[in-house]
Every structure is written in C-alpha cells, then in structure tokens.
Amino acid sequence: LVMDSENKSSSKALSTIKSLLFALIVALFIRYIFVQPFKIPSKSMYPTLMVGDQILVDRISYGVGLPCSKSKIIPSFKEIKRGDVVVFRYPKDLKSISCPNGGFVGLSSIYYIKRVVGVPGDIISIDLNDIYINGNLISKKIPKNYFLDGVKHNVYINIFDQGKTEVIYSGNGNLLGNIDSLVVPSESYFVLGDNRDNSMDSRFWGFVPRENIIGKAFLIH
C-alpha cells in the first residue's frame, strides 16, 4: 500500500512537470514565432506611441524568412504597405553581415519601430523638411486610421526586449539632403518616425531591407 501510494505521487509529479514543460514550450513558440512584446523607450513615434507604451508585434503576417534568402519558413499572407508601423533590425548595425547576393542582414538586438511611407517602386523626394511620395506631400499630421489598435493618445519608439533597449543615435547624423527623385528599390522600404523632427529614420540611413523587418505592431497595452 505504501509503495502504491508513492508510485501514484511520483506519477502525479511527473505528469505535472510534463504539463509545465509543454506549456513553456508552447509559450516560447508563440513568443518567438507568432507575437513578440516590445516596450517604447523614446519619442520618435510620438504621438502614436508614448514612452513606456508596450506593444505586441505580429511576426507571421509578413512571413518568416531565412537570412539572405527569399525563401520563407512561414509564407506571408499580408503585404507590407504604406502606413504600417513596423519593428525592424537597424539596417546599418555594425554587426550586420553581407549577403552573397548583395545587401545585408542585421544580427544584433538593436531594433527600431517606424512607419512605412515608401514601398518598392515609390519615388521619394525631399525638400528641406518636406517629404514627397510619388509627388504627394507627406503630412506631419497622422491620419486617425493610421493609429494602432489600443492607442488612446496621439507616436515614437524603438524597442525593448528582455532588457535590451533601442540605442538612441549618438553619432553625428547626416540627413540625405535634398533629393529630386529617389526610387525605393525592390525588397526595400522607406520609413519615418511620426515625430519627424526628433527621429532617426530613412532620411539618415536609407532604406530598410525586407529581411530586416521583424513584423507589424498591432496592439498597445
């Protein structure tokens, strides 16, 4: 009777451990494949995102790809479009690696969050602080339908993940200067912070390669 009781206790404990391990694996799978949380440490996306806001990033809508390859582990079912707020690896990171077919992939934990304003094929023009996409002036006022779900205030950020925060640019940034017409290349995007006067974005370091984009921000909580 004593042995039988001990066996039942051991079996119950083992079952509990297995359940906890399974739950942990599922949580990690969701965390690294489906959604990822980030915390806003700066004001580059103000007034859409405020310092301290926590957001969730959809990692699968754009597909999950392989570095330096157009192949995808999970195929995309949504296109990256103008107005999307995206999180991406800093394209000029010193830890980036060159790809055999050209371009580069960021490897570090430095992430940025900005709004996509130019997609492949768009023509970008810059005249002082005025930016034109295909001849249309990009307003500094963010349209209401561009706000993220859950936003209760008018955005800026970049990111936080397991204690790692986005590095606010500390070097001497140089704007691209006035540009008559710059065509957004294939598999690349032109991004801006909503707080345009206080944002390091494509005006400073150029286009964001498709493979650097982690996902789309979809919820503030």
List where the protein language model places each region.
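Soluble "head" domains of membrane/secretory-pathway proteins
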Residues: V2-L14, F29, I33-F34, F38, ...
